[in-house]
Structures are given as structure tokens and as C-alpha cells.
Amino acid sequence: MTSSTGMEAHNPLTSGDFTEVSEPFRLFAEWLAEAGKSEPNDPNAMTLATVDPDGLPDARMVLLKGLDARGFVFFTNTESAKGRELAQTPKAALVFHWKSLRRQVRVRGPVEQVTADEADAYFATRPRLSQIGAWASSQSRPLEGRFALEAAVASATAKYALGTVPRPPHWTGFRVLPVAIEFWHDRPFRLHDRVVFRREGEGADWSRTRLFP
């Protein structure tokens, strides 16, 4: 485990003193920044959990692409399994786990689509081949073989040539509006630090509760 005792001694956001912090978004942003320095790959990776039409849980890894005062933002194909599940049941849970820091964050709440302007702005920042891929991939649908995917990529590449690749209508972002955010920090002998922040809905005040490990 990478030691950060010097920093922890002076920064309540990154030490056991985080249990006294009153603003969870600020605490999360600090932890994410710390993870960016120590995680070997994708510190913004998170498990996204949804439920299917039968009520069975479904989970996969996605990347956090935005964090603001309202919530946690990711982008995807609305025709994918997760897109269809969120359309039917717009609620989700997220889990961030940073092994290098021995920390975990859990998030739960309703989900909304981002605005078209937000989706357009983010799509414009993606590498061109990723933009092409958004058109070429019928995400979560059966694929006959790799050649079929490559043919779809070639077709989309030819279609847009050297021009701007527009955002597909089925590609957008979702924002998880948290009603609960739990922070977990590993401690010796499994005497971990756990704090959960809860609120009744967006804009409501947060309550803070320390939990037994």
C-alpha cells in the first residue's frame, strides 16, 4: 500500500479526518485527484449497476466523464443494454474502487439524460475514430464476426470522409443525481472508516452518518 501519511496528517479530505467533512462532492473530487496520481489505469473507472426488465441487477465498467454540483456523468449508446435499462428504470448505483489508495466510493440515485448541448460538446472532444465507432457499433447487438464491425467502421469512415462527424442521435450522456454517497477507507485489522452522506433529493441538505465497518 502506498504511504501518504505526510499528506494525511494535514489534509482532512485525504485522511481519517474525512469523516468530519460535510460536503461529499468536494471530498469525492479530492479523492479522484489523489487516484489520478496513483492508479496505473483509468482512475475514473466505475462500476455502473442498473436493473433489467425482470428486475435482475446488471453491472459493467464505464468511465466517469463529468462531475458537477448536480452529479456524476457518463456517456453511452442509448440502444445498449444499459441505455435500455435506464430508459425503463432511471435509477443506478456506482462504485469507484481505487486499490492503490485502499479506498472505495458508492453512489446511488435517480438518473437523467444530459442536455443535447452537453452531449454535443463532449462528443466533439472525442478522437475521430471514437466518433466513427459510435456510428459503426450497434452496441450490445449480436455481431456476426470482427469483419462485420470493421466493414461498418469502413462505411462510416467513407461516409464522413474528412468532414465533421456529428453525434449519433442514439449516443448521449446520463447524469446520476446522488441521494447517497458512501466513502470507505481501509484501516488495519478491518477497522475501516466509513461515512455515508444522504439527502432526500437534488438541492436538499446532506446528512452525514459514520458507519461501523
UniProtKB/Swiss-Prot annotation:
Cofactor note: Binds 1 FMN per subunit.
Disulphide bridges, residue numbers: none
Pathway note: Cofactor metabolism; pyridoxal 5'-phosphate salvage; pyridoxal 5'-phosphate from pyridoxamine 5'-phosphate: step 1/1; Cofactor metabolism; pyridoxal 5'-phosphate salvage; pyridoxal 5'-phosphate from pyridoxine 5'-phosphate: step 1/1
Broad enzyme group: oxidoreductase
Binding site for substrate: 65, 122, 126, 130, 190-192
Swiss-Prot/TrEMBL keywords: Flavoprotein, FMN, Oxidoreductase, Pyridoxine biosynthesis
One Pfam family linked to the record: PNPOx_N
Source taxon at top rank: Bacteria
An annotated GO BP: pyridoxine biosynthetic process
UniProt-recorded Gene Ontology molecular function terms: FMN binding; pyridoxamine phosphate oxidase activity
Residues that hold FMN according to the record: 60-65, 75-76, 82, 104, 139-140, 184, 194
Cofactor: FMN
Family statement drawn from the similarity comment of this UniProt entry: Belongs to the pyridoxamine 5'-phosphate oxidase family.
Known function: Catalyzes the oxidation of either pyridoxine 5'-phosphate (PNP) or pyridoxamine 5'-phosphate (PMP) into pyridoxal 5'-phosphate (PLP).
Name used for this protein in its record: Pyridoxine/pyridoxamine 5'-phosphate oxidase
